[in-house]
């Protein structure tokens, strides 16, 4: 954990002795094999935490040891969940604004497409623009020493002026992200208007959802809808989605114990 750099937490450790004590006078090759190692967590490089697998070779000497390390990146694949319900929520102000939004499902693989719609039931405010964002929230540590960091990975900006743009995020983070701004609405919406949503996830740097990994950290994703009126007032609603890594075509299915994607 980056805020606790002095401590490292091992969750897996296997050791093999490749050669008995002796003299090494010329180049020599030693073979090794760690069989059927269960790697229960996926590799992760976040804002405040890093989970890594690596091979370490150590040559013990009377003086300083010679140590070399090689990182291994581990993916954890899942199969699609049997139950995948849609998300339906609304946001509004009494007698001024009432908007309903719907997403076709709540769990997505990392190359999936988010399909949904925004439906305006009541509009008595002049909406300047809307934003649809994917937010990653990383929680590390345990209470009372718990840290929460949020970063916006994707932001679709909807305005009454067509300005496709690329810009840097406004928050301070150790990770550099890019915002993608696209127009999906021209002018202020009227009552009964429906705006479709179609967001392709494959082009963005996303990880699966992680929950209580080794009781050290969690990573969750949220779809955030924000509306801003002419007076710069903001109305927003967030809904959690679950992301998982789908096994490539032709790869054997994930293990049975990983079949069901957990639901918060």
Give the positions of each predicted feature:
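C-terminal beta-sandwich interaction modules and adjacent acidic
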Residues: 1-264
